């Protein structure tokens, strides 16, 4: 994208093996961290996993004794950890949390979306979740024709809306890329753009002004994700919806965003990634906070592009979900 080289990225994969036997085999829950953050093997091996392995069964078991309790496990993983300074710790905990929820759903013999809907949603998961295709990356030798061919492939696969990167080229070149994509998808409302937090305030505002006439789906991460003032100034300067949140890793971070970042409950998009931000347990706290502040959960579009986020979106009734075809 405009900031990092994904070919250099690594990932952590966690398997949580239970003593529950089905069809002659132990049930195992699997988890992996989302794209955009590196593997967390050191934190997992040195701090997070030993705490779980040393916990008693009572420390991890649900109240009825028939399953694991991810919230109890989360508390064990975060024992002896100070608040704040989340760094890569949130990714390590979130990766294990994914594996635990996968295992809990398998023990319950229910899809995770159904389980989440019953526990925290309306009782019934969404039958359909709108999914958009995230692409439009920068590659050597990739011109407008290649970009348009990529977008055509997404439409042929059944996607109705797409997202492309900006900020890795000049503003003039990016506008040409945007116009080339709109020529394929039909109108700007079917296209979102993502700067991956690359811009300073001056450039973020220049892009906001230039993007205004296109009526885009949203303008994503114009500046550093923790620069709430920049985000607020940009949001106030444009009618294009602002999207951000994939690099905020706690309930408190998200609360500060909606307090100080100029985000609007009417059209802004919140993109917190459950696996990168301490997992479903913390994500549920974040959702409760949003509801207290008058935000609909349908403004949430989880980052990640994996099945975990899709099940969360379906189970809790979110707006849409990202796919990385």
Model-predicted regions and their roles:
Residues 1-12:
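Short, Gly/Pro- and small/polar-rich lid/capping loops
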Residues 11, 286, 302-325:
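Flexible C-terminal active-site loop/helix
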Residues 12-20:
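Short beta-strand elements
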Residues 20-107:
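Metal- or metallocofactor-binding catalytic centers and their adjacent structured scaffolds
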Residues 86, 127-148, 166-167, 195-200, ...:
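Active-site mouth loops of central-metabolism enzymes
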Residues 112-142, 177, 182, 186-188:
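N-terminal small/glycine-rich loop or linker at the start of catalytic domains
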Residues 164-302:
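Catalytic core of soluble alpha/beta enzymes
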């Amino acid at each position: 994208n405009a900031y990092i080289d994904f070919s250099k990225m690594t990932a952590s994969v966690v398997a949580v093996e239970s003593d529950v036997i089905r069809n002659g085999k132990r049930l195992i829950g699997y988890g992996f961290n989302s794209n955009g953050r590196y593997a967390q093997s050191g934190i997992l091996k040195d701090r997070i996993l030993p705490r779980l392995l040393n916990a008693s069964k009572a420390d991890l078991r649900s109240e009825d004794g028939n399953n694991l309790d991810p919230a109890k496990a989360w508390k064990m993983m975060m024992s002896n950890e100070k608040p704040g300074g989340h760094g890569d710790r949130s990714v390590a905990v979130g990766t294990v949390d994914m594996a635990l929820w996968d295992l809990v759903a398998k023990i319950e013999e229910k899809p995770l979306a159904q389980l989440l809907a019953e526990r925290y949603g309306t009782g019934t998961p969404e039958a359909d979740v709108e999914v958009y295709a995230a692409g439009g990356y920068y590659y050597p030798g990739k011109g407008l024709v290649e970009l348009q061919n990529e977008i055509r492939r997404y439409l042929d696969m059944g996607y109705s809306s797409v997202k492309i990167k900006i900020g890795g080229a000049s503003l003039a070149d990016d506008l040409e890329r945007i116009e080339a994509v709109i020529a394929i998808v039909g109108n700007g409302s079917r296209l979102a753009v993502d700067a991956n937090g690359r811009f300073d305030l001056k450039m973020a505002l220049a892009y906001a002004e230039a993007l205004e006439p296109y009526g885009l789906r949203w303008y994503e991460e114009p500046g550093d994700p923790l620069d709430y003032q920049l985000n607020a100034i940009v949001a106030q300067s444009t009618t294009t919806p602002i999207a951000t949140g994939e690099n905020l890793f706690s309930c408190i971070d998200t609360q500060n965003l909606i307090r100080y970042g100029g985000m609007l409950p009417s059209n802004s998009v919140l993109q917190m990634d459950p696996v990168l931000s301490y997992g479903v347990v913390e994500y549920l706290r974040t959702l409760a906070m949003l509801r207290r502040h008058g935000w609909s959960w349908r403004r949430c579009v989880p980052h990640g592009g994996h099945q975990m986020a899709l099940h969360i979106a379906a189970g809790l009734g979110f707006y849409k979900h990202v796919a990385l075809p």
